[in-house]
């Protein structure tokens, strides 16, 4: 078992290890990768998003809508902004993901303790976050939205009532959920 670096200096080691295990690291961007990932996962398990702790590059382009018979719908071209990110994520070999998770779990556990959970198992938080994402409904048809001047909201009350993390997944499109 290799010696792990201090949490503060772990990002270069994590990136190098991911790279050597076949994970494409180009989309990753964070100077504190482990800490940021832990904060993101902790928030995801509660259905929330943390936009200031993004560990991957944001997609190019803007959210787009289209009008059909006077109603607004998410333009399917809007979903394509996320294709590269989703393709990258699903390209990660499960074995490499598990191996690296197990290797760096002590650092993730330390970071989890720093944000207020010193006695909780980070793996439980990870599984809860995955459950939240897996519970996102997959739309069968075009998704109707309303323009509320500041932002678009979902016309379907069931979609609008979803936690922010699931609403973000809906914005990525049914093929990317």
Language model feature labels by segment:
Residues 1-71, 77:
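N-terminal Sec/ER secretory leader and immediately downstream segment
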Residues 10-24, 78-91, 162-170:
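Acidic/histidine-rich, surface-exposed loop or edge segments in extracytoplasmic proteins
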Residues 27-34, 98, 174-177:
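Generic detection of long, well-ordered alpha-helical segments
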Residues 38, 105, 127-130:
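Generic structural concept
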Residues 45-48, 52, 93, 112-119, ...:
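Long, hydrophobic, amphipathic alpha-helical segments used as structural scaffolds
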Residues 64-124:
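Mid-length scaffold segments of soluble, non-membrane domains
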Residues 121-137:
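Short secondary-structure subsegments characteristic of cysteine-rich extracellular domains
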Residues 141-177:
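A cross-kingdom marker for long, charged
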